[in-house]
Each structure stands twice: as structure tokens, then as C-alpha cells.
Design a protein with these regions (language model features):
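Asp-based, Mg2+/Mn2+-dependent phosphohydrolase catalytic module
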Residues: 1-9, 128-164, 168-230
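Active-site neighborhood of HAD-like aspartate-dependent phosphohydrolases
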Residues: 2-48, 72
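Generic enzyme active-site microenvironment
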Residues: 13-15, 115, 164-165
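Conserved Rossmann-like nucleotide-cofactor binding loop
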Residues: 19, 26, 120-121, 170, ...
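A metal-dependent, Asp-based hydrolase signature
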Residues: 26, 37-40, 50-87
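Short, acidic loop-to-helix structural element flanking the phosphoryl-transfer center
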Residues: 64, 87-114, 147
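Substrate-recognition/cap helix-loop segment adjacent to the acidic, metal-dependent catalytic center
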Residues: 103-113, 117-141
């Protein structure tokens, strides 16, 4: 990558879950499948393990939770069915409306990159099966805690300005504290984190708030850059 190439001076960093992909619907589909496949009690046990693991790791690990569930249920023949459901889930059907249009808009304005948290198997699978890997032309970064890896992001995608699009205000705040006026934070109000008014109120207001990811298309590069200086 040529560090002086003007097309890379503005880099758009897109989150995946509840930013491009409706992950709440994915979780709801998994919940229904678990109840149908292993029953209400075992499904509840899976989600208890899932929440415990998320607390330990700092990200959602659906397959990791299934692995731990397997330790307690080593002879459950339904586990393979649940695994197939997860691995073969049609993530492309859960892309938010106009999410790809928003990505294409960003690509016209600069460089578009996926910047996500997650495990090293299921999250890449989600990015691939949703079609996002191809739409972003392979420009995908997945970390354990992405807000702690901004130096690596800069090394891989040097830019004079960054645009961070994420449904979690906590992460937008952390990135803004690190990059300051070099980043414009964009908050799509999608998903349960974004719609939790009490949670959102704990943090400073992002530079730009949009009701849906497709609304990013309404902003010119000049408007996006200017918003960082408010």
C-alpha cells in the first residue's frame, strides 16, 4: 500500500454486528433453534455459558460457548445439528437495508475497512458468508479488543483522517479519545446497545448520529470531516 496515495487518506472503519449485520436477529434465530433442538432448559444453559464467556473474553463467542456446553453435555446428539446451524447460517439475509450502499458510498470517498471484534473462526465466517469479505475486497481486521489495536490499524491503513462507524458508543468514545480530531465517530442507532438510552447517556455524543446505516449516504466527505471538529 502506498502511504502517499490520496485515495487512502480517509479510511472508513466499519463495525459488523448491528452495524452492517442485524446480529440481534441472528441471536433470536439461534435462540429459537436451540429451544427447538435441545429444549428450553438446555437452551437457557447455553446462554448462561455464552454470557459468562463474553464477560471473560470481551466479545461474543457463539462457537466457544457451544464448546463449553459440550463439556457438560458430551453425549448430546443434537450438538452437531446446532453446530451446522451456526456454521451455515445465511448471514447475507441479515444485512441491514442499504448497508452495502453505505459501504459503496464510503469506497467512493476513501478506503473502506471492516474493523470488528470477535473470535478467530466464527466472526470471519460471518464476514465471508454475509458477502462482506468480497464487498470490502478483503480489507478486514478482526481483533479481541479493537479499541486497543488502533496503532496496528494505523500501520495497516495509514490515513490523515479516519471515520469510525459503530453501534457501541463506548467504543466510539474510546476511539475519539485516542485519535481526537483525526477521527469522525458515526453512531448508527441499530441494535440493543444503540437503543439502550441509559447506556448511551453514559458517554459523550458521537460526532454524527444516524438512524440507520443507509443514512451514511446522505453525508459528503466534507460534512464528515467537518463533524470531527465540533
Amino acid at each position: 500500500m502506498n502511504r502517499t496515495d490520496a485515495s487512502f487518506r480517509t479510511v472508513f472503519l466499519f463495525d459488523v454486528d448491528n452495524t452492517l449485520v442485524d446480529n440481534d436477529r441472528v441471536a433470536a434465530d439461534l435462540q429459537r433453534h436451540l429451544r427447538k433442538t435441545v429444549g428450553e432448559t438446555c437452551a437457557r444453559h447455553y446462554w448462561e455459558i455464552f454470557e459468562q464467556l463474553r464477560s471473560e473474553l470481551g466479545y461474543a463467542d457463539y462457537l466457544g460457548a457451544l464448546q463449553r456446553y459440550r463439556v457438560d453435555h458430551p453425549r448430546d446428539p443434537k450438538l452437531l445439528e446446532v453446530s451446522y446451524f451456526m456454521v451455515n447460517y445465511p448471514f447475507a439475509n441479515r444485512l441491514f437495508p442499504e448497508s452495502l450502499d453505505a459501504v459503496a458510498h464510503a469506497q467512493r470517498l476513501g478506503q473502506a475497512v471492516i474493523l470488528s471484534d470477535g473470535d478467530v473462526v466464527f466472526q470471519p465466517r460471518k464476514v465471508d458468508r454475509s458477502g462482506l469479505y468480497d464487498d470490502f475486497e478483503g480489507h478486514v481486521l478482526i481483533y479481541v479488543h479493537k479499541e486497543l489495536q488502533l496503532a496496528d490499524v494505523e500501520e495497516k491503513y495509514p490515513a490523515s483522517h479516519y471515520v469510525m462507524i459503530d453501534d457501541k458508543v463506548r467504543l466510539l468514545t474510546a476511539v475519539k479519545q485516542h485519535w481526537g480530531a483525526r477521527v469522525t465517530t458515526v453512531f448508527p442507532r441499530q441494535g440493543h446497545y444503540a437503543l439502550d438510552a441509559a447506556l448511551v447517556a453514559q458517554y459523550p455524543q458521537p460526532d454524527i448520529t444516524i438512524e440507520r446505516i443507509g443514512d451514511l449516504q446522505k453525508y459528503s466527505l466534507e460534512q464528515i470531516l467537518a463533524a470531527a471538529l465540533k
